[in-house]
Swiss-Prot record:
Gene assigned in the entry: bioB
Upper lineage: Bacteria, Pseudomonadati, Pseudomonadota, Betaproteobacteria, Burkholderiales
Cofactor info, note text: Binds 1 [4Fe-4S] cluster. The cluster is coordinated with 3 cysteines and an exchangeable S-adenosyl-L-methionine. Binds 1 [2Fe-2S] cluster. The cluster is coordinated with 3 cysteines and 1 arginine.
GO terms for MF: 2 iron, 2 sulfur cluster binding; 4 iron, 4 sulfur cluster binding; biotin synthase activity; iron ion binding
Species the sequence originates in: Burkholderia pseudomallei (strain 1710b)
Ligand binding ([4Fe-4S] cluster): C69, C73, C76
Record function comment: Catalyzes the conversion of dethiobiotin (DTB) to biotin by the insertion of a sulfur atom into dethiobiotin via a radical-based mechanism.
Keyword Metal-binding: yes
Keywords in alphabetical order: 2Fe-2S, 4Fe-4S, Biotin biosynthesis, Iron, Iron-sulfur, Metal-binding, S-adenosyl-L-methionine, Transferase
Similarity remark: Belongs to the radical SAM superfamily. Biotin synthase family.
Presence of keyword Lipid metabolism: no
Protein name, per record: Biotin synthase
Chain ranges of the Radical SAM core domain: 54-281
Catalytic reaction annotation: (4R,5S)-dethiobiotin + (sulfur carrier)-SH + 2 reduced [2Fe-2S]-[ferredoxin] + 2 S-adenosyl-L-methionine = (sulfur carrier)-H + biotin + 2 5'-deoxyadenosine + 2 L-methionine + 2 oxidized [2Fe-2S]-[ferredoxin]
């Protein structure tokens, strides 16, 4: 090596090592394994540092395009691969969607989510969905859509329409994922989330528990979410609804205390996220839902139907919040 090469070698900037994950799976498992009271106490402390602990955001979810999906997700009634008796429908008209949003607002919702059963939207679908987004925002509602995988230009188009959140769940841990779906890779999901983030849209990303996964695999899902940089602003936690005709129709029901633990672990690992009680809430009695709020859930999907499965009735939800001394709040009013 020449003198010049030696000088060059000694002044070369060393390559930085990859940043260590904020949450190792082992760390998340350790949270799960805390005594129940200790876990909820820590989660509630974390929750109060960032949010009004008695405020809940009410969200309504509308299926704007039902059934006929190309994906083979083992939990989903809308997959064309499963015989669930669900008839495929076309994309709803804009006026019909806006009428549903208006009703949701009248019933107390402050967030309106629109879901379409697609592997990915075609470009021709984007324009009417942009109209829906603008119309819902004009009502003063927060907007979220879930349409499947997105291309970069599609994410940018939704951002230009003013979309607040894009939902694209990871569903489960990387290790368990292959047992649930074969038509879309884990990396496909991560790529869509990156495009959403790059477009300047808030990320809504969570998963489903109770699909037969182990606690370690539940911890793997939470670690994946918590280690995103930044972690999602919105984290829906779904409790599997076992639907006749799907591969998971006979899945063993999850211990409800494990569901509450998952809410608490999500709150601790993602302290500033909206943690949302999503599908499967009708499987939890009032006491378990109250424990979920204590564990840090600060949003719930509200209304009689959640995509194609049942949901506790709106009136029952209002009564539960009143019994608990809690109240529905705008997202902007939730922070402490």
């Amino acid at each position: 090596m020449t003198e010049a090469q030696t000088a060059c070698a000694t002044t070369e900037t060393p390559v930085a090592a990859p940043a260590a994950p904020r949450w190792r799976v082992a760390d998340v498992i350790a949270l799960y394994e805390l005594p129940f009271n200790d876990l909820l106490f820590r989660a509630q402390q974390t929750h109060r540092e960032h949010f009004d602990a008695n405020a809940i955001q009410l969200s309504t979810l509308l299926s704007i395009k039902t059934g006929g999906c190309e994906e083979d997700c083992g939990y989903c009634s809308q997959s064309a691969h499963h015989d669930t008796g669900l008839k495929a429908e076309k994309l709803m008209e804009v006026d019909a969607v806006l009428a549903a949003a208006r009703t949701a607002k009248e019933n107390g919702a402050t967030r309106f989510c629109m879901g379409a059963a697609w592997r990915n939207p075609k470009d021709r679908h984007i324009e009417p969905i942009k109209e829906m987004i603008r119309g819902v925002k004009d009502m003063g509602l927060e907007t979220c859509v879930t349409l499947g995988m997105l291309e970069e230009h599609q994410a940018k188009a939704l951002a230009e329409a003013g979309l607040d959140y894009y939902n694209h769940n990871l569903d489960t841990s990387p290790e368990f994922y292959g047992q649930i779906i074969s038509t879309r890779t884990y990396q496909d999901r991560l790529d869509t989330l990156e495009r959403v983030r790059d477009a300047g849209i808030n990320v809504c990303c969570g998963g489903i528990i109770g699909m037969g996964e182990s606690r370690r695999e539940r911890a793997g899902l939470i670690a994946q979410l918590a280690n995103m940089n930044p972690y999602p602003e919105s984290v829906p936690i779904n409790n599997l609804v076992a639907i006749e005709g799907t591969p998971l129709a006979n899945a063993q029901a999850l211990d409800p205390f494990e569901f509450v633990r998952t809410i608490a672990v999500a709150r601790i690992t993602m302290p500033k996220a909206m943690v949302r009680l999503s599908a499967g809430r009708e499987q939890l009695d009032d006491a378990m839902q109250a424990l979920c709020f204590l564990a840090g859930a600060n949003s719930m999907f509200y209304g009689d139907v959640l995509l194609t499965t049942g949901n506790p009735r709106a009136e029952a939800d209002r009564k539960l919040l009143a019994r608990l001394g809690m109240w529905a709040s705008e997202a902007s009013q939730l922070s402490a």
